[in-house]
UniProtKB/Swiss-Prot annotation:
Keywords: Cell projection, Cytoplasm, Cytoskeleton, Nucleus, Phosphoprotein, RNA-binding. This is Ribosomal RNA-processing protein 7 homolog A. GO terms for cellular component: centrosome; cilium; CURI complex; cytoplasm; nucleolus; small-subunit processome; UTP-C complex. Residues 59-159 form the RRM domain. Its main location: nucleus. It comes from Pongo abelii (Sumatran orangutan).
Amino acid sequence: MVARRRKRAARDPEDRIPSPLGYAAIPIKFSEKQQASHYLYVRAHSVRQGTKSTWPQKRTLFVLNVPPYCTEESLSRLLSSCGPLQSVELQEKPDLADSPKESRSKFFHPKPVPGFRVGYVVFQKPSGVSAALALQGPLLVSTESHPVKTGIHKWISDYADSVPDPEALRVEVDTFMEAYDQKIAEEEAKAKEEEGVPDEEGWVKVTRRGRRPVLPRTEAASLRVLERERRKRTRKELLNFYAWQHRESKMEHLAQLRKKFEEDKQRIELLRAQRKFRPY
């Protein structure tokens, strides 16, 4: 019985890889030294008829089981032999078909959760998807020409990437605030035009406006706000926080009382000498 199983396993070809229904399996290895293969499960991205999708149909490859060490650059290099690529994006979970695609900020975005991810690979031509589905492996993620950083080298690189460029950060913040101010101005102008105008049913929309105007986003106004906050923090600072500070403050207070007492005694002696002492 055991001999039959061994013969059957020997006759089975290596390319027969179990995969989920509708997916093709692509074996990959981290490097040449690794013996075991990891499998990417791919299929052509498709949605139901009449449903909008942020990814182009017939040119998008959906990838499952992407390991943490496989970056967008690595996945792009692995699939570059299938045809010219337009974009590669890795995500924590698949996109909803009807969810709007938001622009990704370079600095303000949630930290990705470490673990396996899904990928969307967009080719310039539909033939790239067909070539990727027929791709044979194993493919190497880390090579001598394109090494993948691991260990302390990866930690150093991640730390360096976590420090933003001040000028690029300022440009992105200014761009966002300009777009936000423009949006608010358009909404206020539209509300002002519709003020007092009845709708189809004869109702008049009443909007509340604050008495205090919005502070302008100028450098002088920002400096005034910062100075006001600094003075407020100074007033709220803890006094006599430590025990030795409390003892010193009590000693200084007693010294001031003694000094005032001596000054009062001298003044009383002086008034007695001048015979103008009036205790009541």
